[in-house]
Amino acid sequence: GSIDTNTPLLERLRFIAIASSNLDEFFMIRVAGLRHQVVNGIVKYDAAHMDAKAQLKAIDESVQRLVCMQRTYLNNVLTELENYGFFFTNPDLLDVKSKAWLRHYFEEHIYPVVTPLAVDSGHPFPFLTNHTINAIVRIFQIQPDGTKDYKIAILPIPSVLDRIIEIPSRGNKEHRFVYLEDVITYSANQFFQGYGIEDYMVFRITRDADLEIDEEEATDLLSEVEASLRRRRRGDAVRLEVCGEVKDNLLDFVLTSVELEPKDVYRIDGHLDCRMYFNFCNYPGLDQLRYVPFEPKLP
């Protein structure tokens, strides 16, 4: 998989993306089901004679270790990609020309599809769809007496855009990429004219997607499945992933808003959701970093 250095580099990256996707499914179904047992006081024991609470604790310990390992392998792969001229960087580290290009890209493609959401007494915390990435931002205005008046807003990272943005090359062999959420947080002041940015935090919520269908009670199985699918889209939160420099006040605010506890938080060293690398693995001209496509032949 991602560890075996004999495996082509982009196949190792693809494996990391697959593992990330599988872990999402595991939380949406298996962890959600165990949480459901705990909440409803259902006592069931598995083959190791562990109840749901004990299983959840063991899962948490394993997943925390797994996520750390995954990030180590990912960083190794991204570092190796630099040997082939592929660099993942931050918007603030770009040269003047590249920053100008990115500013134009932001104004043309990103700004029009991002809708900031206010969170205050008149605007409750919005329902954030499963696996979307969002930034919570604390903004302020200076009052006449010199104090800061704070507000909270959510910047949804649009899923209609590719998470990985390539910066046009400067005629050399280097390919440079930035992440969509970094561009949005880097330009966050564009969304809040007249406000200062105090701090922000990028996060991702995983929701319960376990289908609960009571076949005994359901007179019409089709409508029961449809109702279950509707509930699934608005399932309870089961995991919160955060990355970067985590601000405790913002983390507590999100936890309270989505009804999770500190034990449900996974702090990610790097960018959230490795599934974004699936597309990158098909980058043209890098066939030497992929397996040779299998061509079926007639016997």
What are these regions (language model features)?
Residues 1-299:
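N-terminal localization/anchoring segments of enzymes in phospholipid and broader phosphate metabolism
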